[in-house]
Amino acid sequence: MLVKICGVKDVEAAQVALESGADMIGMIFVPGKPRTIQVSNAKEVVSLVESKRKGLNSNELYDSLKPGQDSLWFEQVHDSIKSNGPYSVGVFRNQSIEEINNIIEEVDIDFVQLHGQESHDEYIPQLKKPVITRFVPNETKVLQSLKPNKHLLPLFDSEAGGEGVKLNWSNLSDWSAKNNARYLLAGGLTPDNVHEAIKLDGVIGVDVSGGVETNGVKDYVKIKEFVKNALQ
């Protein structure tokens, strides 16, 4: 099970997450958001993540993957991240390809997460790092999320992504079973419910931000509990 702690704004929270066993540290680069990280802090987080890495960097990891079909591709990605990580993730929303690539160059994040209405066919080939794409499961184009090689991993989130709104897990589990889906799950996860989330069909990773905060600030106890319960 992959664990991603998102919305990290400083190296101290990243340290707690990594020591607890997190595989990915997410940072928000969308301007003007409460969780937007300063570039100087992001560089510190990336440096820390790199110091903990067990193996390949992100581009080496992507190049090492063998073209697969359907769930096999995403299971391969899961195994590679687990054995080589941890990795840093930069989250972007409806920002230009040029802006994203500039931040990649400046901060040297490992993965890009597209969280808006970007054209995946346009963006993914032009971005300089592997891409995690966010989907809302009730979208008509959600089957795009199952296409291997187009992106690193699909992330299923609620329509109000980043606001702690929980998906309909029952419907998602049924849909995933029918389509043999593999995905990261976000939306309303907490230390108290993540043990149920990891049992859903198709879940190979969990992604949390607000669920490990108290009054809008990362809560180290909640981070530790979330990772522990996700990896049980």
Curated annotation (Swiss-Prot):
InterPro entries: Aldolase_TIM, PRAI_dom, RibuloseP-bd_barrel, TrpF_fam
Pathway annotation from the record: Amino-acid biosynthesis; L-tryptophan biosynthesis; L-tryptophan from chorismate: step 3/5
Biological process, per Gene Ontology: L-tryptophan biosynthetic process
EC number: 5.3.1.24
Pfam families: PRAI (PF00697)
MF GO annotations: phosphoribosylanthranilate isomerase activity
Keywords, sorted A to Z: Amino-acid biosynthesis, Aromatic amino acid biosynthesis, Isomerase, Tryptophan biosynthesis
Domain of life: Eukaryota
Catalysed reactions, semicolon-separated: N-(5-phospho-beta-D-ribosyl)anthranilate = 1-(2-carboxyphenylamino)-1-deoxy-D-ribulose 5-phosphate
UniProt similarity note: Belongs to the TrpF family.
HAMAP family: PRAI
Protein name, per record: N-(5'-phosphoribosyl)anthranilate isomerase
Organism name: Wickerhamomyces anomalus (Yeast)
Protein's gene: TRP1
